[in-house]
Structure formats: structure tokens, C-alpha cells
């Protein structure tokens, strides 16, 4: 849940959102930051030197898109269907599914498939199988390797089905 739902946190939190994932337009790399005025004033002091601007067509397109809330409100069911499709397909592989909720990533345990590290497995998977995954160890400062990788299911169904077909052959 968002920190904005908790009064004690909302008054001192930055809420960061990505249009790309939220509105299923991955790759657009446009987002928002919401926070109390005092916090955003400080945030803008730093942000102005990190990011110059977002191109105008993206801003206009997103502003127009956001005027109709229906597509946004349909996204939970949209992503649930994709998660179910991908998880059901992964269940037919040797990869062990790990519980996921509230995300567009499916984590899997690879220990039953390989002795490679997460990172080496992901590199091998792209080169030899043609499927991309991210090693969870990439998110740890010490590279902690749990033999867990994540797949993004915020993709076209055809892409997911092609990936599943390849993963079944592992």
C-alpha cells in the first residue's frame, strides 16, 4: 500500500509513480513525485539538476490519457490476467514460482534448474534461450545470491507465450 494512506507517513513521504508501468506504456520513462509542499520544494532543488525535461508529446499524451480514468481503473484486472497467464505457464516449467502480489514481476527459484549464479543464469538465459530475467542479487549491495530471478509480465501476450514456450524446454 502507498505511504499516502497513512497520515503519519504521508506528511513525510515522497510518493514516486511511473506512468510506464502504471498505465502499461513501459519504456516511456515518465513519472511523478507527490509529497507535501515543503518536501517537494526541496526535491525540486535537487531534481532540476538531474533531469532537464520530458519531451512535450509525452506530456501532452499522458495528460490527455489521464482525463479518462477507465483504462487506469481496469489495470488491476488487466495485470492479474497477465500474471495468471504467466504463472500458469511457468508452473509447467522446472522453475519454482514464488508468491507475488501487487507487482508486475514474477519471481522464481532457479536452484532446481541450474548451479549457475543468478547473474550468470540470466546472462545465459538471454544468450542461449532468448528470454530476459533480472537477478535479485542485482538489488543487494553485497550481491547476495538466493538463486532467485524475476520476470516482468507487463508484456504483450504473444511475448509472454513465446517466453513460456522457451522456458518449458529448460
What are these regions (language model features)?
Residues 1-170:
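PLP-dependent class I/II
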